[in-house]
From Swiss-Prot:
Subunit structure: Homodimer.
General function of this protein: Catalyzes the decarboxylation of four acetate groups of uroporphyrinogen-III to yield coproporphyrinogen-III.
GO BP terms, alphabetized: protoporphyrinogen IX biosynthetic process from glutamate
Name under which the protein is recorded: Uroporphyrinogen decarboxylase
Lineage of producing organism: Bacteria, Pseudomonadati, Pseudomonadota, Gammaproteobacteria, Alteromonadales
Cellular component, GO, one term: cytosol
Organism: Shewanella pealeana (strain ATCC 700345 / ANG-SQ1)
Keyword DNA damage set for record: no
Length: 354
């Protein structure tokens, strides 16, 4: 593997000195880019794009050709793991992901097998190794997975949900059944992420997109507990370097202290949290990633610049901050506005690292 030329992102996650705040964007390889749309059209559909290692590599690299970013993130989907468990993932126009065979009974959960990441998920591993090779050491590669709770919401509901009725019913009516599912998912995700590291991922991120839908105590029982299990089982060194781990619960501002106790290296923040307040609460333990509202990218370059300035000032001096959006970039954002965002971070952040 080529030697890493820009390790700013990894250093910031480990709270080591950097010359400026590193920046990347969640969903930076995505529908806001015309070149992504062209490659997706070539693939035919979303999962065909994910399962073609060369096309997955191409879309991963596209934002790096446009922007001076400090990290690449594997192009894939959080639902690859449940798909590999045999649930029959498909995408309904206008409705998002669906499963042919939801796991909403104890019998269906008992039948689930933990997928072999090098077999059923081998296409992801081939994409990871291809991307790592093609990056040529320019920036580090982030691997990722959904959290057990978030994956379980799709598996039990049969797809996307707003109220999470089925899985919350299971949580309170049959908690042992849900714990069985979450336990299998934690084991599956641990294997999956470790395989990504073995194939070249240099940092890991766990996306807990729906943890914020849980009550204060239910979050600890059904989400955090299983992210803790994963963190405990992850490969934390590879290629002579630490492999930093970031946890991101959307709507998780209530639980930053508890999340920081897991032993992860960094926490992702959504835009509802003040990053300066988050630093005061947990900055002695973990780095922070975030957290501009993605909708700010609809604003003028001046408005974007102002928001970046405000977030940098709120975090303050020193390392331990990776600039990002508070969630994925919206598909209708002008790519030029994303460029304004990245340029503003480059321009404004060095003063905080003298």
């Amino acid at each position: 593997m080529a030697e890493l030329k820009n390790d700013r992102y990894l250093r910031a996650l480990l709270k080591q000195p950097v010359d400026r705040t590193p920046v990347w964007m969640m969903r930076q390889a995505g529908r806001y880019l015309p070149e992504y749309k062209a490659t997706r059209a070539e693939a035919g559909d979303f999962m065909s794009l994910c399962k073609n290692q060369d096309l997955a590599c191409e879309v991963t690299l596209q934002p790096l050709r446009r922007y001076d970013l400090d990290a690449a993130i594997l192009f894939s989907d959080i639902l690859t793991v449940p798909d590999a468990m045999g649930l029959g993932l498909y995408f309904e126009a206008g409705e998002g992901p669906r499963f042919e065979r939801p796991t909403d009974t104890i019998d269906s959960i008992k039948k689930l097998c933990i997928p072999d990441p090098e077999d059923e998920l081998g296409y992801v591993m081939r994409a990871v190794s291809t991307i790592r090779r093609e990056l040529k050491g320019e920036v580090p590669l982030i691997g990722f997975s959904g959290s057990p709770w978030t994956l379980a919401t799709y598996m039990v509901e049969g797809g996307s949900s707003k109220a999470f009725e089925k899985i919350k019913k299971m949580a309170y009516e049959e908690p042992a059944t849900l714990h069985m599912l979450l336990d299998k998912l934690a084991d599956s995700v641990t294997l999956y992420l470790n395989a990504q590291v073995a194939n070249g991922a240099q940092s890991l991120m766990i996306f807990d997109s729906w943890g914020g839908a849980l009550s204060h105590h239910a979050y600890r029982e059904f989400s955090l507990r299983y992210m803790q299990k994963i963190v405990d089982g992850l490969t934390r060194h590879a290629d002579g370097r630490q492999v930093p781990v970031t946890l991101f619960t959307k709507g998780g501002g209530l639980w930053l202290e508890s999340m920081a106790e897991t032993g992860c290296d960094a926490l992702g923040l959504d835009w509802t949290v003040d990053i300066g307040d988050a630093r005061r609460r947990v900055g002695h333990k973990v780095a922070l990633q975030g957290n501009m509202d993605p909708s700010v990218l609809y604003g003028t370059p001046e408005r974007i610049h102002q928001e970046v300035d405000q977030i940098l000032a709120s975090y303050g001096e020193g390392t331990g901050h990776v600039f990002n959006l508070g969630h994925g970039i919206h598909q209708h954002v002008d790519p030029e506005r994303a460029g304004s965002f990245i340029n503003s971070v480059h321009e404004l952040s060095p003063q905080y690292h003298k």
